[in-house]
Amino acid sequence: MVIAYVDGSFEKSIGRYAFGCVILTPDGEEFRKSGSGCDPEGVKIRNVAGEMLGAMNAVQWAKEHEYPAVEIRYDYEGVEKWVTGVWRAKTPLTSKYAAHMQEAAEQIKISFCKVAAHTGNHYNEEADQLAKSALLRTDENVSIYRKQMQFT
């Protein structure tokens, strides 16, 4: 099983959201992913867009590398609760996120683990820093769509 720490960030002054993701493999390898976007729908939900993109990217990475399972470690509860149905997805993007993750769960086992934010958890803090750093990168824009993550 792959373990992925995910986090999101938002900067109002530049109208961008971002994600950071640290992926840990059973062999002890570590991979880092990050990206940012400025899609108007994503900007409306601020850092939540990044939180969701982090989870989606972690699942995509695990599938591409043929792992049978991924555990998403997150500090924002919606990452799990929209997927499991504990929370009702009320916006177009949270609905798309939930549908995307539920569909992905038919191909790979996805589990979730809540971690406390900003409490010194090394990998969670690193995911947070990756997201913050990605805010300033404008070479790619990341958006959430029903079937895939769109890089424009």
Regions found by a protein language model. Name each.
Residues 50-54:
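Loop-to-helix element that buttresses phosphate recognition and phosphoryl-transfer chemistry
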Residues 1-49, 60-61:
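RNase H-like nuclease fold core
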Residues 9-15, 56-126, 130, 135, ...:
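RNase H catalytic domain
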Residues 150-152:
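A cross-taxonomic marker for long C-terminal extensions/tails that follow the last structured domain
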